[in-house]
Amino acid sequence: MQTVVITGGTDGLGRGLAVHYLRQGARVVAVGSTPAKGKALLAEAAAVSAADRAVFLRADLTSVAAAEELVTTIETTCPSVDKLVLCAQRYRLFGPRTVTSEGFEHSFALAYLSRYVLSHGLRKALESAPRPVIMNVGTPGVPLGRIHWDDPQLTHGYSGTKATLQSFRANDLLGVAFAALYADSPVSHVGYNPGVVSTDMPNHLPAPLRVLTKAAFALLATSVTKAVAPMVRLLDEPPGERCTAYRSSRRLPLKGPAFDQDAALRLHHLTQDLVTGAKP
Ligand SMILES: NC(=O)c1ccc[n+]([C@@H]2O[C@H](COP(=O)([O-])OP(=O)(O)OC[C@H]3O[C@@H](n4cnc5c(N)ncnc54)[C@H](OP(=O)(O)O)[C@@H]3O)[C@@H](O)[C@H]2O)c1
């Protein structure tokens, strides 16, 4: 039986994938921070006769310690992991800079560090599966944002947009570094941009932007059911190359600073130091 681990598996795209794989007979481990959402997913699993294959793990992935604890829990309860899907995200485009209890800027911690810890931490469990794949869901192919090498925690000149875009670019580099570091690993790392998808995401935005985003979503957004279909195809038939990027079904060239190998390895080493010390 396949094991599919999905962060953000209790809502939006992650939930869509969780329900799909439960229906397909896989064991699904869904991670989220809200117990009520986990309970609702388990109820849906029971409704499709998959209660014995559905697991909800509550974790606040803004915390490196929580992400590491999650790795340990998954390693000790799952003999192998076939698919790791990284969807946990909460945009903070406005408002003041906030810092986690471990001292990291919020977007850096949730949208990037947790994905770094889970990708590297679960590598061995993934390598025990026949066709392992990591799908890192974000915005590859969007030419915005950069790594602020001299101040990645954005202690100076912070803006929520800057932090969010930095976390996206960091995830592009995470895939490149992963492939460079483990060239002989069978794990396929897919950076994935789903396009505009109608999820709960706008409800977490501040009021004026929420209204605008919802209006734009009503015109432009794909449903979760439709958006999940090309994701499933890639997850079930991962590309042969170790690192790839897609926007929906379209393969993206790994060109430009977002996919630069030197920058990727530089960020890897910087992150390794941060995670080891668990402080910026
Ligand atoms: N929707 C789009 O149009 C779109 C476009 C481009 C890229 N994406 C990317 O697709 C991915 C999924 O987005 P979505 O729209 O499906 O999001 P969503 O509907 O808002 O779901 C986000 C998920 O992340 C979890 N989460 C948030 N904060 C967390 C925390 N601190 N710890 C653990 N889990 C946490 C949420 O669970 P809790 O609420 O329980 O914490 C929820 O399950 C994201 O990476 C996003 O950047 C989405």
PLM-predicted stretches and their roles:
Residues M1-V29, S33:
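Canonical Rossmann dinucleotide-binding motif of NAD(H)/NADP(H)-dependent dehydrogenases/reductases
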Residues S119-H120, V176:
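A short, exposed helix-loop element centered on a Lys and neighboring polar residues
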Residues A47-A65:
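Rossmann-fold cofactor-recognition segment
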Residues E69-T76, G95, E102-A109:
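Active-site Tyr-X3-Lys motif and surrounding loop/helix of classical short-chain dehydrogenase/reductase
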Residues S185-V187, G191, V211-D273, G277:
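C-terminal helical subdomain
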Residues R90-R97, E105-F108, E127-P186, N193-P208, ...:
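Catalytic loop of short-chain dehydrogenase/reductase
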Residues T7, P79-Q89, M135-G138, V190:
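Rossmann-fold scaffold of SDR-type NAD(P)-dependent oxidoreductases
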